[in-house]
């Protein structure tokens, strides 16, 4: 239940989920590397399954656990002067719910897409028990709709409870979901011929049988709604049968429950802070300010998503009509609810990286952040303006021109606080004694990704351009540069900056540099060509494309493998640093290497005249043991006497 242990669990969990998401992305890029569906062999349902699972895993189970599970759990208690989170046991429960949701989403990518039977709102697998019945069933599939495939079994009602042993059918695609360890004929018939008792009851009471729908690629495994759960595809059994869509809905609800439980243990920091820090934001590190702000945003928008998904499930199974237009519902309402969650979620994923940048930049420029008050207010304005611009995701659903103009104007206005941040970063870098290190290079890469993603997003705020490129690869390139580029670069920057604090070892500079070069080059090579594909009008969510676009898609697939190489170097670096057990020193635990007189105000504690000589003379300590054995209040007792010359 220790908050540091739970934070490390979140980090390790995000690493494994990131690998699974990268594997799904590899399947997508192999499919799109060449025209003609070379990987999925024309199976469009499988492509939708993989793309949906990839999107949900990367958003809900990679980026969110890194920032709000890893960084927040580890750093916030120390930065506010608390020994632990408010509810440690609840915090542990919140983490262990995450793998359940992840496993449900990951299963979607591996569902079978052929030979399914859809039986109104009750689905089961159909397994004929002999070749003649299989031939009759094939005739039923090919057009004899009046034929009942269970007629022969009903005629043999003498064997209703004593079936003959089932024979294996060769040259078919049928498989078994049930396992009968004792090979009992009654259990065998009960599982594989579950319609017999129902058919017999129908025969007795002369009631009308339910309709049977059988297709080669039935909708039980279909996820036509995508990762956005768009209605009516997600709320109507006609488009997504009983199966995959319900699993996705339950997984998202579990992820929302886990996130809500975790943020409740951290958002109560006002009752845990040290005296004098309750209303003094300037005395709290910027990363903690950004994390606490985004936790508030999560507390607002996560219940909205959960309510929308639950209403969709009720439409599917309990015959309600929240999103059914035929019975007075509104399918557009779900999109409003989802994007009221979805657009603040974008800022929830990117704002913590602002905090990381504002922690890293003063450390490597040897000067204070330029205008910290303006940086704080810029982040607050950006976060709360994100609640009123969700409509720019919905220009194509039939919004009137007045609503479009309002959403477009406010979206453009969000560029102002983002510009304030970039200007302050530039002023901090101006005339600074910059110490170029691996973490600083990650910060520079993060800024370039954020600039490109922000500019392309600003262009999407224009209604005319958005309508033209909304369903093209332009949008794919934009949000991947923001998430896989800016958000993940911010996470890597913070991870390398706090590497000694988190893992008690020094990172490998060689593998870290290779990780930076290959990952950055791979992301640019993968997604920058997609801007040209989008301007050419190539639609997204389609698993095939004309040969005319082979060049750009081939380049994007090559870039993806560069990104995979960078991810491999990241794990090689972790293995190298932990296997060699490179000891960390207290100087890397948060004391800046300053070569000139400086004043570092850290919770009303003033440290003056710290030099490189003092930092190098600090004894080597076990940082993990130091953190666990000392609470934050005892840090004030640790005094380092400056060298007097």
Curated annotation (Swiss-Prot):
GO MF assignments: cytochrome-c oxidase activity; heme binding; metal ion binding
Q: Which residues bind heme a3?
A: 478
* Domain of life (superkingdom): Eukaryota
Instruction: List the GO cellular component terms.
Output: mitochondrial inner membrane
Which Pfam family name is an example for this entry? COX1
UniProt enzyme class: translocase
- Positions bound to Cu cation: 343, 392-393
Q: Name one GO biological process term.
A: oxidative phosphorylation
Q: Reaction catalysed by this chain?
A: 4 Fe(II)-[cytochrome c] + O2 + 8 H(+)(in) = 4 Fe(III)-[cytochrome c] + 2 H2O + 4 H(+)(out)
Q: Which residues cross the membrane?
A: 8-28, 56-76, 90-110, 247-267, 282-302, 337-357, 376-396, 410-430, 438-458, 475-495, 513-533, 555-575
Q: Where in the cell is it found?
A: Mitochondrion inner membrane
Q: Where is this cross-link: 1'-histidyl-3'-tyrosine (His-Tyr)?
A: 343-347
Entry EC no(s): 7.1.1.9
The note on cofactor binding and number reads: Binds 2 heme A groups non-covalently per subunit.
UniProt protein name? Cytochrome c oxidase subunit 1
Phylogenetic lineage:
Eukaryota, Sar, Alveolata, Ciliophora, Intramacronucleata
């Amino acid at each position: 239940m220790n908050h540091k242990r739970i934070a490390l669990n979140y980090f390790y969990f995000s690493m494994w989920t990131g690998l699974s998401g990268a594997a799904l992305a590899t399947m997508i890029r192999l499919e799109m590397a060449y025209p003609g569906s070379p990987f999925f062999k024309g199976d469009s349902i499988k492509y939708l399954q993989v793309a949906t699972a990839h999107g949900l895993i990367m958003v809900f189970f990679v980026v969110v656990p890194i920032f709000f599970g890893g960084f927040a759990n580890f750093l916030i208690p120390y930065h506010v002067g608390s020994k632990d989170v408010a509810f440690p046991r609840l915090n542990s429960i919140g983490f262990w719910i995450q793998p359940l949701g992840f496993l449900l989403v990951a299963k979607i990518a591996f569902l079978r897409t052929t030979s399914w039977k859809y039986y109104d709102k009750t689905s089961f697998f159909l397994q004929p028990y002999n070749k003649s019945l299989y031939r009759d069933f094939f005739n039923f599939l090919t057009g004899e709709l009046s034929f009942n495939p269970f007629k022969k079994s009903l005629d043999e009602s003498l064997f209703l409870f004593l079936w003959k042993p089932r024979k294996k059918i060769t040259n078919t695609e049928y498989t078994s979901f049930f396992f009968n360890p004792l090979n009992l004929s009654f259990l065998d018939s009960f599982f594989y011929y579950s319609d017999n008792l129902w058919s017999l009851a129908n025969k007795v009471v002369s009631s009308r049988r339910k309709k049977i729908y059988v297709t080669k690629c039935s909708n039980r495994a279909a996820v036509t709604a995508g990762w956005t759960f768009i209605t009516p595809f997600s709320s109507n059994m006609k488009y997504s049968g009983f199966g995959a869509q319900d699993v996705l809905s339950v997984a998202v609800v579990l992820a929302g429950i886990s996130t809500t439980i975790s943020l409740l243990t951290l958002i109560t920091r006002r009752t845990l802070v040290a005296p004098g820090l309750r209303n003094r934001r300037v005395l709290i590190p910027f990363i903690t300010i950004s994390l606490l702000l985004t936790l508030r945003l999560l507390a607002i928008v996560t219940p909205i998503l959960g309510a929308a998904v639950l209403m969709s499930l009720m439409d599917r199974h309990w015959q309600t009509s929240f999103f059914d237009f035929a019975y007075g519902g509104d399918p557009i309402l779900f999109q409003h609810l989802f994007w009221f969650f979805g657009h603040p979620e974008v800022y929830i994923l990117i704002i913590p990286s602002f905090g990381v940048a504002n922690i890293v930049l003063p450390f490597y420029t040897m000067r204070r952040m330029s205008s910290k008050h303006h940086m704080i207010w810029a982040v607050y304005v950006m976060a709360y303006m994100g609640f009123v611009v969700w409509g720019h995701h919905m220009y194509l659903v039939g919004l009137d021109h007045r609503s479009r103009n309002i959403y477009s104007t406010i979206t453009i206005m969000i560029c102002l606080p983002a510009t304030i941040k970039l200007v302050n970063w530039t002023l901090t870098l101006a005339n600074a004694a910059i110490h170029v290190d691996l973490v600083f290079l990650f910060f520079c890469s993060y800024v370039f990704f954020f600039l490109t993603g922000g500019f392309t997003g600003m262009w999407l705020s224009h209604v005319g351009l958005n309508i033209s490129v909304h369903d093209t690869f332009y949008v794919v390139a934009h949000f991947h540069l923001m998430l896989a580029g800016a958000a993940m670069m911010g996470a890597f920057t913070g991870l390398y900056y706090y590497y000694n604090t988190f893992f008690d070892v020094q990172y490998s500079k060689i593998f870290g540099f290779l990780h930076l070069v290959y990952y950055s080059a791979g992301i640019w090579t993968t997604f920058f060509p997609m801007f040209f594909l989008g301007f050419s009008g190539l639609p997204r969510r389609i698993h095939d494309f004309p040969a005319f676009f082979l060049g750009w898609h081939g380049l994007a697939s090559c870039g993806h493998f560069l990104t995979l190489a960078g991810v491999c170097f990241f794990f090689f670096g972790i293995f190298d640093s932990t296997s060699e057990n490179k000891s960390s020193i207290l100087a890397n635990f948060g004391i800046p290497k300053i070569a000139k007189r400086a004043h570092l105000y850290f919770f009303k504690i003033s440290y003056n005249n710290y030099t490189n000589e003092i930092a190098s003379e600090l004894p080597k300590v076990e940082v993990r043991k130091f953190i666990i054995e000392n609470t934050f209040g005892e840090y004030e007792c640790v005094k380092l006497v400056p060298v007097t010359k």
